[in-house]
Amino acid sequence: MPIFIDRRLNPKDKSLGNRQRFLRRAREELKRSIRDKVRAGGIAELDREHVVPIPRKGTGEPTFGDDKESGRRQHILPGNRTFSSGDLIPKPGGGGGYGSAAGTTESEDDFRFVLSREEVLDLFFEDLELPDLVKLNLKQVLSFKPRRAGFAASGAPTNINVGRTMRNSHGRRIALRRPKQAELDAIARQIAELEAKPASALVRERIAALREALDRLERRRKRIAYVDPVDIRFNRFDPQPLPNANAVMFCLMDVSGSMGEREKDLAKRFFVLLHLFLTRRYERTDIVFIRHTHLAKEVDEHTFFYHTESGGTVVSTALEEMHRIIEQRYPVAEWNIYAAQASDGDNFAGDSERCIELLDRKLMRLCQYFAYVEIIDERESHIFGATENGTSLWRAYNAVDGKWPNFQMRRIAAPADIYPVFRQLFARQPDLRKSA
Amino acid sequence: MVSQARKSELLFSGSDWNFAKLARVYDEIEALGLEKLGLDIYPVQMEVISSEQMLDAYSSVGMPLMYRHWSFGKRFLYDELLYRKGARGLAHELVINSSPCIVYLMEENTMALQALVIAHAALGHNHFFKNNHLFRQWTDAGGILSYLDFAKSYIARCEERHGLTAVEAILDSAHALMEQGVFRYRRPPKLSSEQQREGLRERLEYEERSFNDLLRTLPPSPGKSKPEATDEILAERKKSLKLPEENLLYFLEKNSLVLEPWQREIIRIVRIIAQYFYPQQQTQVMNEGCATFVHYTLMNTLFDRCRISEGAMLEILRNHSNAVFQPAYDDPRYSRINPYALGLDMMQDIQRISTAPTAEDRDWFPDIAGRGDWRDTLLDAWANHRDESFVRQYLSPTLIRKWRLFMLADSADEPHYEVASIHNERGYAKIRSALAQSYDVGASRPDIQVIDVDLLGDRRLRLQHTVKNGIMLEGASRDATLRHIRNLWGYEVSMVALDAETGAMLSERSTKEI
């Protein structure tokens, strides 16, 4: 007689921990795969669902294995019907071995992870954060919204909750046995009936007794009010702080003649990325598009990117326009203000100083973050890649860069640069602090 | 016989099973196995599990206890995926080489299948585990479960103390070297008891704390010049490190300069488990063949004695023939030679040669042909062979013809395969030898050894890959594996590939270039 053990009621999912460990690992691969895809396929790709296959061998477990493309082997196979010794069999396409027939490969399905748009974006933005967001929120709770929070025994008359009050009064009346009107009426009727009868000593006595009872009931009714102050309940409201989760992004773009299609395209991609990022992080995100030549104008998105217009370049006009709009519509107390400026760096002589002044005196105090992206020629990228030299605007902004930690500037030469630069600009910077 | 059969009644009827029926069937089958086949088995412990639990057990390399690692989770998800899609059925049974021998029965199985599983696993595999010399010498059936228990809790403790990531890094690296983590020629020591392990670990930690000669890195005194690396010193160094060493995990565990004691212990655990599975890899055909032969013989005997109904027998036969189905090489279902089919056919062939040999058989197998005692021949083969030697010894021309085996010579630089031998007079020996060769695990795995390391110099670990038949290592996975070795060794690791015949250097790769 063997030993039997019934294990069916044992806990299942013994491998749950293993699966969790695997998924955690797979996540890394997913992230990498998403990044590669977006880099290759363009930013529009980002806003879609994705199916990401992870090869079964994907989360790699390397070992020393034979290279199938080298060496001499012998295969023993069953089921020969036609061959005799010395026959030559051509290898199927491109020397991939004898397919499965050589007994070396097994066809293996991949795992497929279907990621929703949200998951894709989450993976994409996982470790990005707009600087200083938390601090501002903690510091300034600016608006409150009343929220119902039960009942109170005191309050303003407008807040009386009639239903609750009447229920209390009803209960109290029952508990204290307040005489009902019907009882009084009944006694009054009896008295009236007796009074109509010929008066006798007995009747008078009855009437006197009834009157006394009536009197007692009426006094009791007066004592026990229909609605007593203790019954009254008021609606109670709690002021609830509203998180200040509004962000406005200013897109400043130079559209002068020197900004060609390539430059605009790069700038656009950068703004799209920034916008996606902001919508992801904030409840409410506004975008203000400002384009400028020698004049700056607030425009809608389509005009911003596609309208053709040309002229000289005076960068400071855009900054002034931005300042004007902030004053008008975006009180600093309520809005997190971000700005991204894209330009090829050409500027009207002498205007760069004005830009410095504008940023230094006004804008940098208002902005949470100001990112300047200079779009340069691909041929220049290796020259200017790491130097401080450059256009007049670049040199001018360098001065601002040193002074304000919430100011960042980078150069972009090709679409592939955008994402890394974006990451650099918006990577978590724990020591970034708004000075003064 | 016939009169006895008439008298006897069915062991079970219907497809439902219960424990009473299982016990009755087991007792009957066990008695029959001992009587008819002369089997010798470990005590049996049968565990009834659900299909989910079977998936669990499957994914942790078939062991009931296993430490946690993501690769097992990956296996689980993959198996489950195939199972859900219906691309693959689950095994009906799982058997563990331990004493008592643990046999898993799935609750979904019908009674007929349970009977089949009992004959197959509880008797067939069990007998093989207990008697085959590889298992007897190389695995410790009594100690494995307690060792795994220890391994599991030890690694869990490490995860608590050092963090998941740190443990995972070591396990990943050790897993990559699992195939290079076995002693092929030297018998491993018996698994020690919990107490001994504790003592060993304490000693290890003590050694680690105290002075380690290998770590002496003081610069040489100014007056003395650095000793020249003469042949003598080289030889001395190799001798002190017992080089060359083919067991990479063992070498790293003992000699790595950067590993902490707990990391060494984890490597040791992986190494011991790799070693435990090494005999299984060498005896697939024999093990499955033995179990299949046993269940086929016993079930047929029971049927002949009218102890099981025709319906049950039909179900059993259907499962049996699924298991031993061998498609031809050009069949889309072909993936490899089915070890169940080859093992069973060879064993039945031995039976035939012993009882009804042809003239050819008498030529090829003078020792066993016509001796009639097929049972003793089989018991002897089960006990004393592994796949490679079993095929080399017993694959008969009859079987080669029946299977229509042929041999392809495949040279990577030729645009075609050449049919080197077919199932004819000239081909028998060659086919048999080549097939045997293909089952030699030691020969078919890359031969990689530690050949040298300069502990006083740059501490570069030097590996040598002996290239047989020009078969190189696949580049990407080789580089990744070398990186893993580097993680464990802590310093540069380089590997040269030398041709086995000419000794010419084919390639050299160092972790510096990766």
UniProtKB/Swiss-Prot annotation, chain A:
Keywords in alphabetical order: Plasmid
Signal peptide residue numbers: none
Pfam families: DUF444
Presence of keyword Protein transport: no
Region (Disordered): 54-103
Superkingdom, taxonomy of origin: Bacteria
UniProt key word ATP-binding: no
Family: Belongs to the UPF0229 family.
HAMAP family with a match to the protein in the record: UPF0229
NCBIfam families xrefs: PRK05325.1-2 (NF003707), PRK05325.1-3 (NF003708)
Name this protein carries in UniProt: UPF0229 protein mll9637
Species of origin: Mesorhizobium japonicum (strain LMG 29417 / CECT 9101 / MAFF 303099)
